[in-house]
């Protein structure tokens, strides 16, 4: 498509924004990245996402696509002729991919957040839930290199952004993902070898420092 305008409104530590960065990189779509200050949201963000007022927002030729998973599907549908395919071609496999992306959003984010926003028994419960969630995902991965099989795709894109937060999760939750879920870590390292992922995810220590600042603001330090 010629003369296209693609803009991404994002915030660097957002695992949801990372999904769009990866998907756009996989499809080799050129876009303008606009970093948002979430304490002082831009008029463009408020105009493009008036309902939730959240990032990320993909803007394609002036039209906004909100919610990261929906936007990844949009990228696949609009640029379906550009390799690679991010979603499976088989309807059942596509439904399964959407199921696991939904599971990730409904479970992993909240459990991960509680690891650094809570203490004591509540934090211990969150750690247990978080590790159990990873083990469920390990089961879905099985012995495949990626969740969709031999090819990096939709579920991998939905999940890998969380990996940039794992140093923070482990630091405040006091556990080792590699000890608990070695297959998950092996998958994450495999994904990190892809240029689209490596260039889209911030360094784990940088995210840890960001979380430390948030904890101070929340009065947890």
UniProtKB/Swiss-Prot annotation:
SUPFAM superfamilies the record matches: GST C-terminal domain-like, Thioredoxin-like
Which Gene3D superfamilies does UniProt cross-reference here? 1.20.1050.10, Glutaredoxin (3.40.30.10)
Catalysed reactions, as listed in the record: RX + glutathione = an S-substituted glutathione + a halide anion + H(+)
User: What are the binding positions for glutathione in this chain?
Assistant: 14, 41, 55, 67-68
Induction remarks: By auxin.
Keywords, sorted A to Z: Auxin signaling pathway, Transferase
The Enzyme Commission number assigned here is 2.5.1.18
- Its name, as the record gives it, is Probable glutathione S-transferase
This protein's species is Nicotiana tabacum
């Amino acid at each position: 498509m010629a003369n296209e305008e693609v803009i991404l409104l994002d915030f660097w530590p957002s695992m949801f924004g990372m999904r769009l960065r990866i998907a756009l990189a996989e499809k080799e779509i050129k876009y303008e990245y606009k970093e948002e200050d979430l304490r002082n949201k831009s008029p463009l963000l408020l105009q493009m996402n008036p309902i939730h007022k959240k990032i990320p927002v993909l803007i394609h030729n002036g039209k906004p696509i909100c919610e990261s998973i929906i936007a990844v599907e949009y990228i696949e549908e609009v640029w379906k002729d550009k390799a690679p395919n991010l979603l499976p071609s088989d309807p059942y496999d596509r439904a399964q991919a959407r199921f696991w992306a939904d599971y990730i959003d409904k479970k992993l984010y909240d459990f991960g957040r509680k690891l650094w926003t809570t203490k004591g028994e509540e934090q211990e419960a969150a750690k247990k839930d978080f590790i159990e969630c990873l083990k469920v995902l390990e089961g879905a991965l099985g012995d495949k290199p990626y969740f969709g099989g031999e090819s990096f795709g939709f579920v991998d894109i939905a999940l890998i952004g969380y990996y940039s937060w794992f140093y923070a999760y482990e630091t405040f939750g006091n556990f080792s993902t590699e000890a608990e879920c070695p297959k998950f870590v092996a998958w994450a390292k495999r994904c990190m070898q892809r240029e689209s992922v490596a260039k889209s995810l911030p360094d784990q220590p940088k995210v840890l420092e960001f979380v430390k600042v948030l904890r101070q603001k929340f009065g947890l330090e």
